[in-house]
A protein has these predicted regions:
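Carbohydrate-interacting/catalytic domains
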Residues: 28-31, 55, 60-95, 99-273
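Substrate-binding cleft/loops of secretory-pathway carbohydrate-active enzymes
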Residues: 1-28, 37-43, 104-107
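Intrinsic disorder/low-complexity signature
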Residues: 8, 13-14, 51-53, 117
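Glycoside hydrolase catalytic-domain groove-lining segments
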Residues: 24-57, 82-83
């Protein structure tokens, strides 16, 4: 008679895969790319929650920041990239307190969060990032309107493991589309080309590399990117964008792309013999 009354299920497979992936040095992530993509094989078989709960930041497992390899900048950039990936991935979201502060320490039930970290600029910027991206998430219906069906998701780049990049579309019931491009490598990608749905232009709406969040601000496309009639990834049209190192960008599609008409070549006139 309706079971236990629950309507969502924690996606523990996704959680385990991602925690393993995030701890890897970026060089070795290319050999474990399936940790990043396998969840899409079964993402719509249940109504899933994507959990980074208290259980993932205790018992020597490390805080979210503590899971990331690299120096301070790379760790916090990794937190931002992963959080953007989490919010763009199909499914409801759950993150445990403390991640938004960028704290090193694991959760300790006997003490409070490390609020003193907010005396540091980098931790203030991380907190602002979490505030802004959560507001952005709530304001963008393609990110949450269709979380439990293929109608709300379309993969664009999934199998190119050598560069640690994934790109996919999120879509709402009115057909509005966003593209999420996430780079889990410390190497920025300029002019990164991939096939896209037939929209006229794509504008960058959010970048985790924003200077307000502690990013460099150097890896971005300030103007809308026009769709070109260049085949890529199995599509007739594509765009080339900038993806920051250990970063993510979210693009909004606008207008309708129309394939250019082929130019008619003039027939050569035959000269009389």
């Amino acid at each position: 008679d309706g079971g236990l009354g629950f309507n969502l299920k924690w996606n523990m497979g996704w959680m385990n895969d991602m925690c393993h992936y995030l701890k890897l040095d970026p060089w070795f992530r290319q050999f474990h790319h399936k940790d990043l993509t396998f969840s899409l094989m079964y993402a719509f078989s249940e109504n899933f929650v994507l959990p980074i709960s208290h259980d993932e930041v205790v018992y020597m497992k490390g805080s979210l920041r503590g899971k990331m390899p690299g120096d301070d900048w790379q760790q916090l950039a990794g937190v931002r990239a992963f959080t953007a990936y989490l919010l763009a991935h199909p499914g409801k979201k759950l993150t445990f307190m403390g991640a938004e502060l960028g704290q090193w320490h694991e959760w300790n039930f006997a003490s409070q969060l490390d609020w003193y970290l907010l005396e540091n600029k980098e931790n203030q910027q991380t907190q602002r990032f979490f505030k802004d991206i959560n507001r952005f998430y709530l304001s963008q219906s393609p990110l949450w309107d269709i979380d439990f069906s293929w109608e709300g998701f379309e993969g664009l780049v999934a199998d190119y493991n050598h560069n640690n990049v994934v790109v996919f579309v999120r879509r709402d019931r009115k057909g509005r589309e966003l593209i999420a491009a996430v780079n889990f490598s410390p190497v920025g990608r300029a002019d990164y080309r991939f096939g896209v749905p037939p929209r006229k232009t794509w504008r960058e709406e959010l970048s985790t590399d924003d200077t307000a969040f502690g990013g460099t601000g150097e890896w971005r496309d300030e103007k809308p990117v026009r769709t070109q009639a260049i085949p890529s990834h199995g599509r007739e049209q594509s765009i080339a964008i900038t993806i920051p190192p250990l970063g993510a960008v979210i693009l909004r599609g606008a207008g309708e792309y129309k394939k250019p008409k082929a130019k008619k070549s003039k027939a050569r006139e035959e000269l009389p013999a």
